[in-house]
Amino acid sequence: MTEDVMNDDFDSLVTKPTEFIDYNCDINNGFNDLLKSQKFDKLGFNYNVLSILGCQSSGKSSLLNSVFGLDFDVMNTKLGHSQTTKGLWGALVIPKDTGSGNVTIVIDVEGTDSRERGEGRLTFEHRSALLCLAISDCVVINLWYHSLGNLTGSNYGLLKTVVEANLELAEASENTLASGDYKTVLCFCIRDWFPELAPLETVRQKVVNEYMLGIWNDINKPDKFKNSKLEDIFRFELYGFNHALVHPDEFAKDSSRFRLAWATSISPKSYSRAVPSDGFFYYASNILQTVKDQSHLDIPNQREMLANFRCQEIKGGVLDEMVPSISSMLTDAQSGVMDDFQHRAVELVDVAVGKYLELASRYDKTTSNKIGNELVISVFSKLQPVFDAIISHHCSDLAVRATVRLNEKFAISGKERSPMVGGQKAADVWPKFNMLTDEIKAELYNSLNSHILSCAINYSHESGIQAQSDFDTSAAVDMFNVTFKNEVESVRARHIRALLGQITDLVDSGFKVIGEALLERNVTSDKYWGDVNDLIDRAYSTCLDTMGPCYTGLVPSVQPNEFEYLAFMILLQATKCNLERTESRITDIILERFEQFFQYQEFNGETVPRDWGSYTEEELKQTYTQCKKEALNIVAVLRDCSPPTLEVPAFEVSSLKPNHVLYQELSAGVDSLRATTTSLSDEVLVDTVKACRKRFQEFFRTAQQIQSSSKNGISWKNIPPPFWILLLLCSWNELCSVLRIVFKVQVLIPLIILGFIVVQYFSHLVFGTSADAVFRPFKRQARELAMVGTKWIFKVATSTAAAAVNAGAKTTFLSDDDNDSGKKAEEN
């Protein structure tokens, strides 16, 4: 205690006097600093307050200095009489032995009847008297013995002010007078007295029975005190003090006697105003401000205000202390390692309430419990981020569970035309899609709600403090809804694509049949495009009958005619894609038609290959020209587009919301799909004819070769000698390669020869001459096979030579005929 003044003559420590109330009747915060420096706020109710009232220059400060060993400023009489103490000053008297008594706040009050104060002295005297009576366990009245009997010198006016002020305090209190809560101790200290003048009992009778009782009878008392006695309001004590200068030793003994009486009998065991030490300064400040503003006091209201102020302060301090623990919990929650949130939260609240009650329990219980409830609610509020982190992890787990459940329930398997969803037919599952997803959502939401309830806290403390957690779950619910919706939308989109794929497949499968019709000889524009429109009509009817309920189940909030319009769009789109695909392979179609018409013919209702050997050269040319013309006719069929005859369903695309799952597809419209243009332009047609010309010629030349071979027969004699020389020269490398391979087989050939000799030798050895009869047929067959192979080789060579001879003669016909075909194709 740096400001303590050691006093060997006393068993206590004291502080230097500090201004409490300044000359303008304003409280000084420096006094609060003094209290804090001495850890006064830790005392609880174990302290007392003593103040002294009396006339100016009556020796109040010197009396307090003598009794408690303090160092209040005193008047120097050698310099004349003047005002020394201005305002109120205070000091602490602290027992050296903490168990020997309470700490005492000693307040030295500016003297009354001050000439320096002038006309404002009465106001200050009233305010200071009210303040001292409100905050003091004991008010010392300093009187001079020789002034007893005088009106002014005996402080009669001051005593009257004290009585009236104390009545005002008692009237404002809700406590009964008999309880003793507001029985302020009035201790009269009679100065310059010694026993030879008059016994103290006589002086007591004079002061109490004449002065105080006279004042009691003269003042106007409130109705509740009409029948009350003076002793119901005050407790009187009286002590005599010898002359300090004439009899200093006796004065010192009298001071010691009063100090002992204060410590043993006068001072209460605890502060009688029931204000904890940490709230004393604020209580005194509020009392002074109320006296200045209203000139009267409402003590219970002041206590309630003090309790509310201090408890709020304590609550704020406790919340600050809880921040590290809450941060630690938040870290654990964010890392996903907290499984005991409720237990840890209750422990945290218990610690907070314990710290709070350590100080707040000294104040009004109703107020402290009310703010204690607020403390618990504030702790719950600070735990909101922890709660959010825990629920966020649980929502992530629920998202995984949602994905698993949705994939199990809506797994697509099977063929495209008859898909299975979750082991059931898609047509049975899709109409109930929204209902099934709602069931899964309800199951997962129940899990979320159970987890939220497991984190709820209904806190109750033995002190009466209780509160229930009210964590904001809106963020958790929103997170769950968004997460589940995203999972559902992903599955929904996948199944809608599967449904649209089925609609498209209706057209694709139909075009496979229509594509076969393009190879027919008698195909026409009316027949082809009629088949296309019939396919669209059938597919559209099938969509409405079997897929409408599926679409309604998959897509929420379906507008009237929405599916009809969408199905029409998908069918047109699929039709357009198939037509474009057909047009892109026009060259292959033409070649397939030509090959089918040119290479095959109808015979007895069956398609058989043509026997070109039976055709004359003119018939071959006519057949070639006719087949080429029929093959190219398909171009005119494809170019003669016919728009769909199906009427477009009436549907307002503007009625769709932008968040519709198929908004982009439906917004495209059908106008572009109903266009009658074709990609087979004149330029494309010319390129197509050029690409087909070479293949046509190859087919024709092959037919000519077969025809020539059939007419000329196969004979090596018909082949001119120069051809043999040319053949020998061209195939010389191949012959050498064959010979090298044969001669390289140096082991196989000897083995074959050796095997033949061994078999023949042993056969003759065993069977004799009859063995020749057995081997002769095998030798004859081997020679025949060799001759057949040789004849076949000569036949192929002869045919090749004949074709080469006749090729030049036919080139002019093919060239002229192809030019005519190109012109006809361009006209088509």
Curated annotation (Swiss-Prot):
Segments on the Lumenal side according to the record's topology features: 740-742
Enzyme category, top tier: hydrolase
E.C. no: 3.6.5.-
InterPro entries: G_GB1_RHD3_dom (IPR030386), P-loop_NTPase (IPR027417), RHD3/Sey1 (IPR008803), Sey1/RHD3-like_3HB (IPR046758)
Record flagged with keyword Methyltransferase: no
Domain of life: Eukaryota
Occurrences of domain GB1/RHD3-type G (ranges): 44-284
Protein name: Protein SEY1 homolog
Organism classification: Eukaryota, Sar, Alveolata, Apicomplexa, Aconoidasida
